[in-house]
Structures are given as structure tokens and as C-alpha cells.
């Protein structure tokens, strides 16, 4: 998903969120691919991607299989995409709030400034984008299906006519 929120300064706030609609329980390697494709898509929409592999843990503050999956995926992604700013595993507050980032991961170039979010599974991703859309006043465009031979996109059953029109424009632009 690409999410856009107009700001008072006239510059839109633009975010990318993946995977919110297709991969139910992506593996570490699938998350690496999702991150790379999401970063490339973000660039198309004017985002200089700063990728956060989201978790309930920041740099080892929590334990468990899900934490390990996101930490390992972030490590593999940094190896595969050495020029892409990547942090993980990281909690959402540390990913977006500079004050929190200074406390939880002060050495990170991404923490506090992330704009491309990789969720651990479809549950978290779908909930996350809908919270941003419904409570954060972001317009959500997607899902934008990546990694295919041709652009193909989907729409939420809750979408409106403007979102249908916007997705048609996005699909044509990706062709």
C-alpha cells in the first residue's frame, strides 16, 4: 500500500506498507523480497525509502520466533540491499518517533524516520494500514501487487469511487 496524507505545508506525507493483503505468513526470505520490491515501488512514488522491519521488539528487547524472523529478515535484507537504509527488528514507535528512537536505537539512521514499513504478517499489515487510513487520515492506495510480470492491483471492498479511479491511474503508471 501507498499511503498519502496532505500536510499544512503543502507537501504530502507518503508512506509505503507491506505486506497488507497477499502473503499470510511470509518467511524470512519472502520478507527480504517484499522489502526490496516495496522500496523500489516507494521510489516510483517519490519516497526515499527508509525501511523498518516491524516487530513488538526493538533490537532484542523482546524474545520469540516472530522477533527472530524479523531480525533475521532485516539482516538478510541489509546484505542483499547494502545501499538501502534498513532497520529491524524495530517497534513502530521507534521507527517513526525521533524522541523514542534516540532512546531505543540511537545509532540507527532509519529509526525515527522510517517511511517504508515491512510487517511480520498479513494480520499486522492489514490492521496497520487500516488504522493509518481511518484514524490517521491517510488515503490508502492498494494493494499494489509487486513481483509480477505486469502491473495488477486490487481494491478493498470498503473503497470509494475516488480510490477506484486512483488505483486505475496507479496501475497505468506502473505499466
What is the meaning of each model-derived region?
Residues 1-175:
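Anion-binding alpha/beta catalytic cores of soluble intermediary-metabolism enzymes, centered on
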Amino acid at each position: 500500500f501507498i499511503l498519502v496524507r496532505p500536510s499544512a505545508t503543502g507537501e504530502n506525507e507518503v508512506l509505503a506498507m507491506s505486506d497488507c493483503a497477499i502473503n499470510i505468513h511470509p518467511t524470512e526470505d519472502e520478507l527480504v523480497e517484499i522489502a526490496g520490491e516495496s522500496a523500489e515501488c516507494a521510489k516510483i512514488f517519490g519516497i526515499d525509502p527508509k525501511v523498518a522491519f516491524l516487530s513488538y521488539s526493538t533490537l532484542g528487547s523482546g524474545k520469540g520466533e516472530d522477533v527472530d524472523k524479523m531480525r533475521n529478515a532485516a539482516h538478510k535484507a541489509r546484505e542483499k540491499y547494502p545501499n538501502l537504509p534498513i532497520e529491524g527488528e524495530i517497534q513502530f514507535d521507534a521507527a517513526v518517533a525521533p524522541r523514542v528512537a534516540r532512546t531505543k536505537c540511537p545509532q540507527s539512521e532509519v529509526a525515527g524516520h522510517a517511511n517504508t514499513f515491512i510487517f511480520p504478517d498479513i494480520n499486522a499489515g492489514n490492521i496497520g494500514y487500516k488504522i493509518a487510513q481511518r484514524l490517521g487520515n491517510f488515503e490508502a492506495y492498494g494493494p499494489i501487487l509487486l513481483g509480477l510480470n505486469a502491473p495488477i492491483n486490487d481494491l478493498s471492498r470498503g473503497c470509494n469511487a475516488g480510490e477506484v479511479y486512483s488505483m486505475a491511474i496507479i496501475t497505468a503508471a506502473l505499466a
